Amino acid sequence: MADEQFPAAATALEEYQSIEEQMASPEVVSNPDKLRKLGRRHAELGAIVDAYKAWLQVKDDLAAAQEMAGEDADFAEEAKRLEDELPGVEEKLRTALIPRDPDDARDTIMEIKAGTGGEEAALFAGDLLRMYTRYAEKRGWSVNVQSENTTELGGVKDVQIAIRAKGTPAPEDGVWASMKYEGGVHRVQRIPVTESQGRIQTSAAGVIVFPEADEDDDEIEIDPKDLKIDIFMSSGPGGQSVNTTYSAVRMTHLPTGITVNMQDEKSQIQNRAAALRVLKSRLLAMKHEQEAAEAADMRHSQVRSLDRSERIRTYNFPENRIVDHRTNYKAYNLDAVLDGDLQAVIDSDIQADEADRLANQK
């Protein structure tokens, strides 16, 4: 029996069909939050179901061809072709069954902070913001700046953005599936605009990423008593006030000390809601990292943080070179990468992660 060889795939198919029935019910259709959660799980199971159905089809066709092979040479030839095809289809199914990061289909919150290097570091942080914005545009994602602290020269001291996909993407197409590899220290080597002697300077910016929680995510519960909320005026370049009302929000989670600033929305109420969602996202990421550590899941730990205190990438302007130090990826198209052509760099991280997961599965 097919389900005896791949019981997990058979179970996935049953769940997939059950979810399709639920998503068609009026109760779910009228509940956007529930529909989104079911849609995410449906997309997550889709790759397994497609691979399983393809494997079942080849198995059935092979059995039928073998039955007729003794009577017809064409069927014998077809049986041989299907026998050659079966191992590849089976390998695709085994790969699809390897557990993915459960957050892959989620959207992403990203923080970019200027590090060592003064104004040059802030300018580089601004370059990273533009790079990720253009990359997101190429992927058809939206970018929402939630808070930003800029310098007079146009640099970025720190910025927080939400990167979101349209609809409910398959896990491999989710924002987190790609952006989770960006967390870490990014180093730049170039001649700063403020350098009169033409000397190359090294500076850095830090990137923190975490999957965005749903507004009604019941995995994380926050007691209002654990929150300290400060209200202030939004600030623009150089710290200048950009409005005359106190609509910006600083939300502090007292048990963990996590602080979230939100000033992008038009009203204090909207900023409170947005800040709470970001706080939930950070607590969710913290919870998942703790669970991974307790389970000694080294793959998940590597993917989730890749040690954010370490340098992960170097951007060398004089040589137009970019290097990813985790995968040894190197290319001489830095100008294109900074214009959003980032996929090849990210793919090197995805491929290394998939190879690691496959090795751990065997």
UniProtKB/Swiss-Prot annotation:
A GO molecular-function annotation = translation release factor activity, codon specific
Q: What is this protein called?
A: Peptide chain release factor 1
Task: Identify one Gene Ontology CC term for this UniProt entry.
Answer: cytoplasm
Q: Could you tell me the keywords of this UniProt record?
A: Cytoplasm, Methylation, Protein biosynthesis
Q: Which domain of life is it from?
A: Bacteria
Its localization reads: Cytoplasm
Q: How is it modified after translation?
A: Methylated by PrmC. Methylation increases the termination efficiency of RF1.
Q: Indicate where this protein is primarily found.
A: cytoplasm
Record-stated family: Belongs to the prokaryotic/mitochondrial release factor family.
* Job description of the protein: Peptide chain release factor 1 directs the termination of translation in response to the peptide chain termination codons UAG and UAA.
Q: Which HAMAP family match?
A: Rel_fac_1
Cysteine pairs bridged by disulfides in the record: none
Tell me where in this chain the PTM N5-methylglutamine is found. Answer: Q240
Which taxonomic lineage does the organism of this UniProt entry have?
Bacteria, Bacillati, Actinomycetota, Actinomycetes, Bifidobacteriales
Segments forming a coiled coil: none
Name the species this protein comes from.
Answer: Bifidobacterium longum (strain DJO10A)
